[in-house]
Design a protein with these regions (language model features):
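Beta-lactam-recognizing serine transpeptidase/beta-lactamase-like catalytic domain environment
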Residues: 1-182
């Protein structure tokens, strides 16, 4: 009916996948966010912005080696691997891709659809949903790596008698504070 059409037109994005299936995605904010850039999309958690990126990657690179662009970036940030933190029982987490889904079809068929890896899985991945699994320390470390511009393994300082010379002052840009902490 017309109410449904108006609702979808004003509050949702409709994507047409290359396989012909139609998916409708709604944003969490009823009235939407208007036009946003990358920084605003992160700050306001605008999934639709990131879904658009994933969908572009899917449409351009489906079944191509570049299809794993997002996964490679996630791995560069430290997801899907051990951080090297000096604590026991650390988990690697999972960064899903076509190969993993193909493997799961055989080894864990209850974890994946018969169709395997689809564009919607990439859209889930980019917003941290679906088959991706991460640990809190991986998330914290990924943000730290982004801020630093290089990677380090996190450490737990259990020596409370450390001198002040062992402490490193972290200066955070005021624009960064404004963007992420407001």
């Amino acid at each position: 009916d017309s109410f449904d059409q108006k609702y979808f037109a004003e509050e949702c994005l409709s994507f047409q996948f290359t396989d012909g299936s139609k998916q409708v995605y709604c944003d969490w904010k009823k009235d939407g966010h208007g036009y946003v850039d990358f920084h605003q999309a992160i700050q306001k958690s605008v999934n639709i912005y990131f879904w658009e990126i994933a969908l572009k990657i899917w449409r351009l690179y489906e079944n191509d080696e570049k299809e794993s662009l997002l996964q490679n970036y996630a791995r560069d940030l430290g997801f899907g691997d051990y951080t090297g933190i000096d604590l026991p029982y650390e988990r690697k987490g999972t960064v899903p891709d076509r190969e993993l889904f193909d493997d799961w079809k055989i080894t864990a068929p209850d974890r994946v659809r018969e169709e395997g890896w689809l564009g919607g899985d990439l859209m889930n991945l980019i917003v941290g949903q679906g088959a991706i699994t991460v640990t809190p320390i991986q998330v914290a470390n990924a943000y730290a790596n982004l801020i630093r511009g290089y990677t380090l393994s996190p450490r737990i300082n259990i020596d409370y008698s450390a001198s002040n010379s062992d402490l490193r002052v972290l200066r955070v840009d005021s624009e960064f504070k404004k963007m992420f902490l407001s």
